[in-house]
Amino acid sequence: LFLLVCRLKSSVSFLTRPDRPNLAYHKLKGRNPGVVFLPGLNSNMNGQKATALEDFCNSLGHAFIRFDYTGCGSSDGKFEECTIGKWRKDVLSVLDELTDGPQILVGSSLGGWLMLHAAIARPDKVAALVGVAVAADHLVTTFKKLPIEAQKEIEEKGEWKFPTKHNEEEYYSLSYDFITEAENHCMLNSPIPITCPIRLIHGMKDGDVPWQISMQVADRVLSKDVDVILRKTGQHRMSEKEDTKLLVNTVDDLIDKLATL
């Protein structure tokens, strides 16, 4: 554990941006395609999936980046001022400033939604996608399923206590403005212009983000090279040993595939 803490603290770098908060990241130099990990909502770059992928890329000699969004983890900025649009720009900053050549994006939950946006915005850079419990449109869809009275109350208070099992409070506090801004980034109502290989991993016991969202993404993207992998006992975080093994093997297969294209 001490070594792990040392590793996490020792090599944090910061991407300085003149007009936006600085982003904390860890970068491993290596061959292409590189791998970039996008964490979930209220998560950070030190999660088990991120570090497992880093170790794997290190063993293979491939480039790897994990980072924190604005207002999350070690990055600058205030979480309560963040939006999906700002986090989308964070992902593009990382791709533009920190990577060279083709990249495989691995997006967890909300990171899966952002990875889809990045693939649309940077088609020349994003060579493949791996989603874990992709949460495309999920916050907006969940909000719109609330009774009208509840929606109005949230609008008046300006705050939505989004239920979660992943912290002590059992909710994430999101502003009403966050939800209205997020509506601009919804993508499941029309074809998604992404043509690269896509792998979508989802646990069928996911109590946070329904696995059917991964099926919708698979249906909407223009890419023909799409696999959906459902784990019958998988939870939302997909961080059991077998889940991690599946994730690493999926990335490994894509690296091989891209090498032969």
Regions found by a protein language model. Name each.
Residues 42-54:
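The serine-hydrolase catalytic nucleophile loop
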Residues 194, 200-202, 206:
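Short beta-strand/loop motif that positions the catalytic acidic residue
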Residues 72-98:
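Catalytic nucleophile-loop/oxyanion-hole region of alpha/beta-hydrolase
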Residues 54-74:
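Conserved alpha/beta-hydrolase
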Residues 50, 196, 210-219:
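Short alpha-helix in the alpha/beta-hydrolase fold that links the catalytic acid
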Residues 205-209, 237:
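Acidic catalytic loop of the alpha/beta-hydrolase fold
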Residues 6-30:
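N-terminal cap/lid segment of alpha/beta-hydrolase-fold proteins
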Residues 234-246:
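Catalytic histidine-centered segment of alpha/beta-hydrolase-like enzymes
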